[in-house]
Amino acid sequence: MTKYEKQILNVLIDKYEGSKSFIGTNQVNQSFTCKLDQLFPKYKDDSEYDLFCAVNESVDALVEEGFVIVKKLKNGVVQSVTLNLEDINKVYEYLGRIPKSDIVVDLKKILILYKDCNAILSAYCSRQLERLSENKSVEFFDDDFDIYESILKIVSKITEVKNETFERDFSIQVLGDSKAFEKIRSKVVSILYEYGDFPDKETLLADLNIVKNPGHVYFKGKGKLTICGQQIDFSQMPGDMAIS
């Protein structure tokens, strides 16, 4: 598959997945077409003959596969390329692209799973299910299911924290990784703030008994420190020492 084939097919699939036909609310038959001179601005440039030939060869290959239908002028210029919906599954397979319909199914399963965990997730998940029915994107989902489910898992557990807990300890308790929460903190806070009832986004985590990890004091150079009767001589250390 050439880069031109890939680009053409992805543009056509994007149009299809963003349409009413995709969710079955279209009242008329829709077609999904792209103009090559819009996709490749130099396609009709006489000085770019190599590009013209390469694009046309790619289009011919797609026609041969049965993926597209084209309108071509007598001079060889391809006027338009239209997606053949009858072979849409083969197009996905050819591209190695996961159908949006499959992604939607998986997202719905996750949202339904977490919907009844607490009031915040009830509001958030209900809204995202509505957005999916409207063919809109799911807020805070960036095409990574593992990260997304980690976000929802944190939101499901964070309202249950009774005692003051460091972020890293909470991260280990819920996700089994001391640094995992840090990577998704901003999205977790956004969901909590937008779908919960908190007066201040900045203090939201503290209101839920989740506090920042303790800082560290670094010692280096000449000096001595006595702790519990034992003396530490910094001058004998090759590097620095951190105490939390």
What are these regions (language model features)?
Residues 1-244:
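Nucleic-acid enzyme cleavage-core boundary/entry regions
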